[in-house]
Curated annotation (Swiss-Prot):
Organism name: Bos taurus
Tissue: Retinal pigment epithelial cells. Located in the interphotoreceptor matrix (IPM) which is between the retinal pigment epithelium and the neural retina.
Classification lineage: Eukaryota, Metazoa, Chordata, Craniata, Vertebrata
GO cellular component terms listed in the entry, alphabetical order: extracellular region; extracellular space; melanosome
The keyword Zinc is annotated on this UniProt entry: no
Official protein name in the record: Pigment epithelium-derived factor
Length: 416
């Protein structure tokens, strides 16, 4: 009964993003073809940087779905923005066919913007502003002795704030240099890699990111205790759980996805949206398939402010690994076969490696003890609990631009 009341109350959010996403699939009917009225574009997406953020974020949700499918029984932690940034920067050196392939994967073909790279510079400036607490960086690394055309470097520096790196051919020296770069960009928050350098590199893309959230309302550390986290219907583990018996959050229930959705604000105009299935399960595919920039934007508009009993596991996770196969799955196999990067060099080169290193954490830390006085929770006739004590998905979103900053599938808060 409680769920039904919330469902009716927040029914406007159900299915908006999925319907919009489905309408973009090949062969689907459009308003023009059916004679139906054309839905006016949301004013939020008329802002160039927001529209670009939506496109890049949709790439991010695609990448997450592929990665999650590859690891159905493991945590997934990604900052897709850093990978998208590396690909977008690489497209500066691509001729038309190869450039179009990259732009389609990044959904640039759906936006009319003659200055994609200039707008990307604005997006990066917004999401990496100091108050956001996000560190994100990308780098293009080329094979040893490659002669790069001088015309490639200035636009790369102008829009993406980075210079390419050419390998020395000494794997120990190259790994040390890459580690030093990562340490400098992430201020030591992402661990140094001990993995060996790949033996055959032509183009190596590296995306790194780190985020430590600061809640708008901090948790009382005295209320943190070891509690059960349900890995599945049969297994539990003890993890540190933060709690707030009078938390103010934004909430809704999606009957199509059979999950409870909550949003908590962070400092710096960011927020985390949680997707919690109604039943304990590690199969989160139904939720994952719904995720698009448009759907998340609709959720952000429609959730209602309520007061609830809230418990959240403390989280400190990291990931280091290859995303090469995942990127290939996003209709980018041609970059690994015979692409045309003749704006970079006269020599045939191709993408051979995509690597991702990220760190993410939240704990009790926050800005204050009281929620914003301007936001009054709705009165409910029933108590509301929101316990993240089972597998869930979280989305870290930039409020200003709508950009996807981090996404995670948490099957075990202890990490792997």
């Amino acid at each position: 009964m409680q769920a039904l009341v919330l469902l009716l109350w927040t029914g406007a959010l159900l299915g908006f993003g999925r319907c919009q996403n489905a309408g973009q699939e090949a062969g689907s009917l459009t308003p023009e073809s059916t004679g139906a009225p054309v839905e006016e574009e949301d004013p939020f997406f008329k802002v160039p940087v927001n529209k670009l953020a939506a496109a890049v974020s949709n790439f991010g949700y695609d990448l997450y779905r592929v990665r999650s499918g590859e690891s159905p029984t493991a945590n997934v932690l990604l900052s897709p923005l850093s990978v998208a940034t590396a690909l977008s920067a690489l497209s500066l050196g691509a001729e038309q066919r190869t450039e179009s392939n990259i732009h389609r994967a990044l959904y640039y073909d759906l936006i009319s913007n003659p200055d994609i790279h200039g707008t990307y510079k604005d997006l990066l400036a917004s999401v990496t502003a100091p108050q956001k607490n996000l560190k994100s960086a990308s780098r293009i690394i080329f094979e040893r002795k490659l002669r790069i055309k001088a015309s490639f470097i200035p636009p790369l520096e102008k829009s993406y704030g980075t210079r390419p790196r050419i390998l020395t051919g000494n794997s120990r020296v190259d790994l040390q240099e890459i580690n030093n770069w990562v340490q400098a960009q992430m201020k030591g928050k992402v661990a140094r890699s001990t993995r060996e350098m790949p033996s055959e590199i032509s183009i190596f893309l590296l995306g790194v990111a780190y985020f430590k959230g600061q809640w708008v309302t901090k948790f009382d550390s005295r209320k943190t205790s070891l509690e059960d986290f349900y890995l599945d219907e049969e297994r539990t583990v003890k993890v540190p759980m933060m709690s707030d018996p009078q938390a103010v959050l934004r909430y809704g229930l999606d009957s199509d996805l059979n999950c409870k959705i909550a949003q908590l604000p962070l400092t710096g105009s960011t927020s985390i949206i949680f997707f919690l299935p109604q039943k304990v399960t590690q199969n989160l595919t139904l939720i994952e398939e719904s995720l698009t920039s448009e759907f998340i934007h609709d959720i952000d508009r429609e959730l209602k402010t309520v007061q609830a009993v809230l418990t959240i596991p403390k989280l400190k996770l990291s990931y280091e690994g290859e995303l090469t196969k995942s990127v290939q799955e996003l209709k980018l196999q041609s970059l690994f076969d015979a692409p045309d990067f003749s704006k970079i060099t006269g020599k045939p080169i191709k993408l051979t490696q995509v690597e991702h290193r990220v760190g993410f954490e939240w704990n009790e830390d926050g800005a204050g003890t009281n929620s914003s006085p301007g936001v009054q929770p709705a009165r409910l006739t029933f108590p509301l609990d929101y316990h993240l004590n089972q597998p869930f998905i979280f989305v870290l979103r930039d409020t200003d631009t709508g950009a996807l900053l981090f996404i995670g599938k948490i099957l075990d808060p202890r990490g792997t």
